Amino acid sequence: MTFIEKNTSFPAPRNDLVRATRPGKVDAYPQDWIHAAQELAQEFAQAAVQRDLEGARPVDQIRRLRESGFVSLLYPKNLGGGGGTLHDAAQSVLEIAKVDGSTAALLGFNYYNSLVPLLTDYTGANDAVVRHAADNRFFWGNVTQYVNKEFVAQHHPDGGYTITGTKKWNTGAPLAEITTLLAIHPDQDRYIYAVIPTAREGLEFHNDWDPIGLRGTDSGTITFHNVRIFPEEVLNWGHSPAQTGPLPLWASFGAIFYTAVFIGRTLGALEQVREWVLRGRRQGSFGGVSVSADDPFIQAEFAEYWVQVQ
């Protein structure tokens, strides 16, 4: 029995893969997030390339992110979170991206979306959602693309909404137990944000994501078939005027986490090249050297790449 099954009445996961991401234990939050991320990266490096070649989903890696508390890093301590900083979060994504781009991207999107209840209202009206997420170490999915203009909610006679439509590029949602949800209000003059379980009846996951290098991010298409959104699942919007565009700081946070993934992947690639060169020997002597690492042309080229990254 997992930690969540012992401590919550949250709906059962939609499949065995999602269930396998549930934490079997709950570690204390790290005192040094970046050092802890480096240790996790060493774990994740095992067979990361093979997982991507096979298109295997990073189930065990998400479970470890939940057990270690990284999924709740940005939540305040008084709400049960890790109390980490934005720098801690971005650097953790970067460290993991050096060895496992898919898992790093999923962690970045988790941070991106775990902040939604805090960004939609600064008065604490959504604190219960944050506490629930922190208590359960939830990994967050993402169903928030603004480009799907036909994704319009309809009023439900008992309150809340129903939604029928399709959303593309839903990073992490297939392996998450909860996800943010962005839809156009029935009046079509503003957006609504909600948080729903991915086991909700009417959700169809298409599993159509297959890009080289980031196959494990699970950013596929989801179709909603008359999916119910209950009133208590709709996040409070505490700003004026009504939400007609992206959340406050949304683009900035996205840029930070995307950049962390890109830089981490680049640093990881350079490290792999360095290791290959250090191990390599030439069949003959060129330019007076027989070891590749001693070749001044290779040294100059590597130095140029390194400077560009910096």
Ranges and model annotations:
Residues 158-162, 178, 219:
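A generic structural signal for beta-strand entry/edge sites
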Residues 40-48:
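N-terminal capping segment at the start of a domain
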Residues 49-52, 310:
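C-terminal helix-coil-helix/basic helical segment that borders enzyme active sites and/or dimer interfaces
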Residues 147, 175-177, 190, 208, ...:
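A generic structural signal for well-ordered coil/turn residues at beta-strand boundaries
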Residues 57-67, 72-171:
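Glycine-rich flavin
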Residues 2-29:
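Intrinsic disorder at enzyme termini
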Residues 212-308:
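Glycine-rich beta->alpha junctions and the first turn(s) of the following alpha-helix
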Residues 166-205:
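A short core secondary-structure module
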